């Protein structure tokens, strides 16, 4: 493995990084982005059997993105993007926030196929993915975000205030996504955790079948369909 301040394995700056296979593993950083840093409107495509595993952004202070850190875009446009398809996998990574992935302002994470984010750890929030003012999208297939932990408790996709999982209606979704939210839902104050993705040729409504694949990380909470079909 390697050691760096940011991007222990790869730092993509204003570029496209295609990872069709192979492994980025056992890297450590002193700041954030243990495995991969995406900045300056970069795109990363993980496909085939590509893996990002066992990278560390130290937890002595606030660090983010043990596997991948998706930097903020400040011009209001979609910025840095991570696309996971086929059997791509991010596992065994550690950070303070976003054990596997931390995606900031105007970033995007899209999962499809049998992509998987599992067995990552955060000490604060987002054992799997920390989503802050960004898009986390499911584009069909059977992707899974599960068995990620924060302080020994399930904490998979952590949605900061105002964020929701976006589900494409152009193809069938049959995976499993665990969800935690910054805002605490109550009977009188529902919190949106999923919505239809905005895309060309898309539209429609979420269904009960869609919600069968979204589950709360807290045992006493469960998603309900509002205004769908």
Annotate each PLM feature:
Residues 139-229:
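Extracellular/surface-exposed low-complexity segments
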Residues 28, 42, 77-79, 149, ...:
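Intrinsically disordered, low-complexity regions of eukaryotic proteins
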Residues 2-11, 28-39, 57-77, 94-104, ...:
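Extracellular beta-strand/beta-solenoid scaffold signature
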Residues 8, 15, 22, 34, ...:
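The right-handed parallel beta-helix/beta-solenoid scaffold, focusing on the short coil/turn
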Residues 13, 20, 39, 47, ...:
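A structural detector for beta-sheet-dominated domains
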């Amino acid at each position: 493995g390697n050691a760096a301040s940011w991007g222990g394995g790869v730092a993509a700056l204003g570029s496209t990084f295609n990872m069709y296979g192979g492994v980025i593993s056992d890297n450590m950083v002193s700041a954030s982005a243990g495995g991969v840093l995406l900045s300056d409107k970069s795109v990363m495509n993980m496909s085939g059997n590509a893996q990002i595993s066992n990278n560390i952004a130290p937890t002595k202070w606030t660090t983010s993105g043990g596997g991948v850190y998706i930097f903020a875009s400040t011009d209001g446009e979609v910025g840095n993007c991570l696309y996971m398809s086929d059997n791509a996998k991010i596992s065994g990574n550690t950070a303070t926030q976003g054990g596997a992935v931390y995606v900031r302002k105007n970033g995007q994470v899209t999962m499809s196929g049998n992509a998987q984010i599992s067995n990552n750890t955060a000490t604060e929030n987002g054992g799997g993915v920390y989503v802050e003012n960004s898009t986390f999208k499911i584009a069909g297939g059977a992707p899974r975000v599960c068995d990620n932990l924060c302080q020994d408790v399930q904490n998979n996709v952590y949605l900061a205030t105002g964020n929701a999982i976006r589900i494409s209606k152009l193809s069938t979704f049959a995976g499993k996504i665990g969800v935690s939210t910054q805002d605490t839902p109550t009977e009188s104050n529902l919190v949106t955790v999923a919505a239809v993705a905005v895309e060309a040729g898309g539209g429609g409504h979420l269904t009960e079948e869609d919600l069968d694949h979204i589950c709360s990380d807290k045992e006493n909470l469960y998603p309900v369909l509002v205004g769908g079909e």
